[in-house]
Amino acid sequence: MDARGGGGRPGDSPGATPAPGPPPPPPPPAPPQPQPPPAPPPNPTTPSHPESADEPGPRSRLCSRDSSCTPGAAKGGANGECGRGEPQCSPEGPARGPKVSFSCRGAASGPAAAEEAGSEEAGPAGEPRGSQASFLQRQFGALLQPGVNKFSLRMFGSQKAVEREQERVKSAGAWIIHPYSDFRFYWDFTMLLFMVGNLIIIPVGITFFKDETTAPWIVFNVVSDTFFLMDLVLNFRTGIVIEDNTEIILDPEKIKKKYLRTWFVVDFVSSIPVDYIFLIVEKGIDSEVYKTARALRIVRFTKILSLLRLLRLSRLIRYIHQWEEIFHMTYDLASAVMRICNLISMMLLLCHWDGCLQFLVPMLQDFPSDCWVSINNMVNHSWSELYSFALFKAMSHMLCIGYGRQAPESMTDIWLTMLSMIVGATCYAMFIGHATALIQSLDSSRRQYQEKYKQVEQYMSFHKLPADFRQKIHDYYEHRYQGKMFDEDSILGELNGPLREEIVNFNCRKLVASMPLFANADPNFVTAMLTKLKFEVFQPGDYIIREGTIGKKMYFIQHGVVSVLTKGNKEMKLSDGSYFGEICLLTRGRRTASVRADTYCRLYSLSVDNFNEVLEEYPMMRRAFETVAIDRLDRIGKKNSILLHKVQHDLSSGVFNNQENAIIQEIVKYDREMVQQAELGQRVGLFPPPPPPQVTSAIATLQQAVAMSFCPQVARPLVGPLALGSPRLVRRAPPGPLPPAASPGPPAASPPAAPSSPRAPRTSPYGVPGSPATRVGPALPARRLSRASRPLSASQPSLPHGAPAPSPAASARPASSSTPRLGPAPTTRTAAPSPDRRDSASPGAASGLDPLDSARSRLSSNL
């Protein structure tokens, strides 16, 4: 047979000679099957093994293993050749598809072939012998291996690691049980039930029941002892977890040696069927000896006290703790519940044992006259009444609250009482210690805050600070940490980048939602900004920014109200979602206004270095900031050569395309028009005396740059100079026609412009229609303000959401210029509104008219 036939290999029989003569004739075809092709001539290098044609070889055995192949198709030539025939299918058995039959002849040689032939013998029905047994073995073997579930993935890290652990179990040997397998889980749970039953029932049975030969008692002992003996055997085949390095031992020899050195003796002694020995020996014991032999029942009770049972209970508690983690329970809650349950269970179990011991000792002494049972005449009472009195006596001793109904009189009772007190005091101290540690661990952040504040109090006492200073420090800590202290930088620093960004975005979600700059910007830009923010808290009266100092930070208001103050005693309120101090991040100049906290303020600060670092990755945002800042400085008569040189260099080098330059110019134009509109709104007598027009902030208009940089398609122009498709930037058209006075073009006459002061501030308070700063007048009551109309910045309040953006053609204002006019407004425009105008304004506000339209109406009536 050649090597392809599988019946033999060259070199199997070195002494054989090639078969001479012509090739043998092909075998006769079988009647029910098609004729197989003729066999090829024998290979001269292959030795011939003439055997019986009816003896199947390895290939024929392989063929006969499938019930769909006929045995007749597996026969080959006379010299052991193999030929491939047509697919042969048998109508009997389940449909498995056509099988390709091999015509083989010749016996296999060698031990490997014999082993293969022996393992592939077919049964009478064509199925391999032992296939059903192999299936059951595979299923049971899977129970002995760790499954792919949440617990195993958490323990081993990945599915591939679990598969490697499964291969370890397979290679360790037959019937090796993994400690994290499903079989061990169910077995430990079953042993828990038997263990609890033994810990509770056996002491009661030994102490309060005299007849131990009843059927229920025998059945309970037989079943429990059988399971304990089975557990003893399974412990030799169960892997051992090394707690130090989390290694799992699966080698049978190592498991046996370690188990024999540790808990085998205790487990073996506790699993001996002592009750069976009592039943056998009791038949040959007379009544006089039986009384002394009854003391042997203590052996059964000592088995309950085996440390192995308590160790299994603690192991089950660890399993429960792991299950609670799998079911997404919090760590503190799970550990607290399990520790409390363990302590309560141990206390109750010890009280139960002590109560049984209080009655067991007098019973072994045949109830002497000075024992508590004889004194109370309770010898013949029911076992439930005796157990209740004994348990009450034991708990009184263990809790150190008394001696029970009467003090001990006999020496035995005295020693039992002292033993109960010692055990009870120890358990009570352990319970108090664990409970105290448990309470502290449940609120470690509050405990850390209290420890920190104690140091602060000692510091204040050492420096003898006044009482008002101490109260301010106390209030600061209360509002800054709110009774809990965390090392937030350390916690966030230990997380990976994506998770840290998600947490920062979640913590600042209210800030992002309340700021148009963040709400319309690129998410990557917003994330980069948020990760640089630092949380700060200021008390009422604290000056967050002082005028004349160098600007190193800008602030975003999360909660609170601040006042922006200038040397001209002008004041403007900023609240949640506003920000201030932004221009100094670009110019690195000095502050032009002071900012004071009116309430407790929770702010996020951004340093100039971090801000510039973020802008390095977004040049479009930097260019927009710089261009608007230059235009604002030019309008107040100031220049910054560094910013001017950078912008001119960008224009000359062509860094930005025409579309981006057009967007930036539109932002500058929109910024100018917002300043002029704010100036116009302040000259309607809403905020007497009329403040000078101020310069807007770059950040208030950068939301449009962000939106257009990522969405160049500009929405249809509505009313304002620039309207984007963003829902936060669209200015809706007014519901009614504009007043007649608001005609296109500048007014016929404009007031003379006052000379601008060289010390005009770069960040000064002013208001626009709809901002809190301009709604304090009698014409627009403050109670009709909406939160959406709050100012966005210390230097640029925002228009109210939903209000129409005024355009140069639709606004009655003087002609625009690069530098706004400064100085007082004409007296005709600052006159106090008449009662008629006030009455006319109220219905408009009540009917839903926009505040900006109301201001325009009053302005037209003045004109």
Swiss-Prot record:
Activity regulation behaviour: Activated by cAMP, and at 10-100 times higher concentrations, also by cGMP. cAMP binding causes a conformation change that leads to the assembly of an active tetramer and channel opening. In the absence of cAMP, the C-terminal region is thought to exert a tonic inhibition on the pore when HCN2 is in a non-tetrameric form. Channel activity is modulated by intracellular chloride ions and pH; acidic pH shifts the activation to more negative voltages.
Phosphoserine found at: S119, S134, S641, S726, S743, S750, S757, S840, S842, S847
Compositionally biased region (Gly residues): 1-10
Positions annotated as glycosylated: N380
Tissues/organs with expression: Highly expressed in neonatal and adult ventricle and in brain. Highly expressed in the pyramidal layer in hippocampus, in anterior dorsal nucleus in thalamus, in the mammillary nucleus in hypothalamus, in red nucleus, in trigeminal mesencephalic, spinal and principal nuclei, in cochlear and trapezoid nuclei and in the dorsal tegemental nucleus.
Pfam families on file: cNMP_binding (PF00027), Ion_trans (PF00520), Ion_trans_N (PF08412)
Description of post-translational modifications: Phosphorylation at Ser-641 by PRKG2 shifts the voltage-dependence to more negative voltages, hence counteracting the stimulatory effect of cGMP on gating. N-glycosylated; required for cell surface trafficking of HCN2.
Sequence positions that bind 3',5'-cyclic AMP: G581, E582, C584, R591, T592, R632
Residues covered by region (Involved in subunit assembly): 131-182
Record keyword Transport present: yes
Cytoplasmic side stretches: 1-188, 235-261, 312-342, 435-863
Ranges of the Extracellular topological domain: 210-213, 283-290, 364-386, 409-413
Substrates-to-products reaction catalysed: Na(+)(in) = Na(+)(out); K(+)(in) = K(+)(out); NH4(+)(in) = NH4(+)(out)
Intramembrane ranges, chain numbering: 387-408
Annotated compartments: Cell membrane
Similarity comment: family membership: Belongs to the potassium channel HCN family.
Swiss-Prot/TrEMBL domain comment: The segment S4 is the voltage-sensor and is characterized by a series of positively charged amino acids at every third position. Thee ion-conducting pore region is between segment S5 and S6.
Function of the protein: Hyperpolarization-activated ion channel exhibiting weak selectivity for potassium over sodium ions. Contributes to the native pacemaker currents in heart (If) and in neurons (Ih). Can also transport ammonium in the distal nephron. Involved in the initiation of neuropathic pain in sensory neurons. Produces a large instantaneous current.
Subunit details: Homotetramer. The channel is composed of a homo- or heterotetrameric complex of pore-forming subunits. Heterotetramer with HCN1. Forms an obligate 4:4 complex with accessory subunit PEX5L. Interacts with KCNE2.
The protein, known as: Potassium/sodium hyperpolarization-activated cyclic nucleotide-gated channel 2
The species this protein was found in: Rattus norvegicus
Species classification: Eukaryota, Metazoa, Chordata, Craniata, Vertebrata
